[in-house]
């Protein structure tokens, strides 16, 4: 009781600047977040009366994200859960910081029907891997709905917790671009990006949208993003994730020329596409986003996009990361499926990017440096890519399945022909401890249904 009262006093009355004097390794802003959200069991008070978390953390000093090969303990997963989903809102100086753009809930959110079935294998995978949430939707109903148990990360995750997209945001941006085309802001996927001054003198100027959407603008000599790689070849320390497009282009892409069009997956392309949408929609951008989510997706909770904390709009300050609640991720996937099935204008866009997909051609290809082969994580190891979606999954020959995938094992598979959707939100995935069963959790439900 005494500890609780002391912590309550500190939470209410200790100013932030006293916490901020703590060493970086103690993560004082994270400690304050724990206190502010009632996770007092993870905080102790030291001899000087300063609150410190009591978790045993192993945090990468080099990367913002969990290194792919690492097998973090539960304590470290708690920290990264905070880092991925909340730290950008706390002013934490030790992590990425973005300004949120909030999309309010729809007036009449889509209501799911449930016919829940118990699947012991899914339960075991959610309990033992890095999975935060698992949803399976078929023929208009949710059949499986599992969330991380309390002893894993369940005390931090509920139906109102917004979960980070990671690279699933690439596909979200493509879906938004489809709406921009259908509302007349952009002509079509063969339109040329030749009207945005930010890209002038760079290889991205005069590119066709379809080449950008397919991750094939011929930028592989300048940017390389694979595994835990930094991205910009000329400067491994530069992070485009926290810089506007104008700055990145000015530093590293001036007078660059397009190389051969081959699949070269990287997040900068998506950030350029996102900011091009902002450029074309102008002052209508936020109204445009609200219309998509409130009228089409029919989200139940706030959806959060982000942008840089500083810089002018014309510099390209938008980021492609997005955060939705677990069921709103399913609502978004269902909206995509409905568009495809109903052959709406956006549905025709989705069909077109599927038709225009390109082979990844990664088999046997060597990474930069020539000492390792390209190997994508199994959950997005597909044969082709198109319009910022993964296509042609193993074992699903001749099936039209749209795949969204993001670091940590985040994955959504949408079988647009058979009305099946799998949504996995996950914090870590690798080839050892945190490797979930891709075949049984993702591919088999899409292939066979239930």
Task: For each feature predicted by the language model, list its residue ranges.
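Active-site-proximal loop and beta-strand segments within enzyme catalytic domains
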Residues: 123-124, 155-160, 164-165, 169, ...
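Active-site SXXK
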Residues: 140, 161-188, 212, 273-277, ...
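N-terminal leader/targeting segments and the immediately adjacent pre-domain N-terminus
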Residues: 20-155, 186, 214, 440-450
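Active-site-proximal alpha-helical segments within enzyme catalytic domains
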Residues: 269-276, 320-345, 410-427
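Catalytic-site signature segments of enzymes, centered on catalytic residues
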Residues: 159-160, 224-320
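Active-site Gly/Thr loop motif
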Residues: 299-301, 356-421
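Active-site helix/loop module of the DD-peptidase/beta-lactamase fold
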Residues: 182-220, 254, 281-320, 324, ...
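Sec-dependent N-terminal signal peptides
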Residues: 4-13
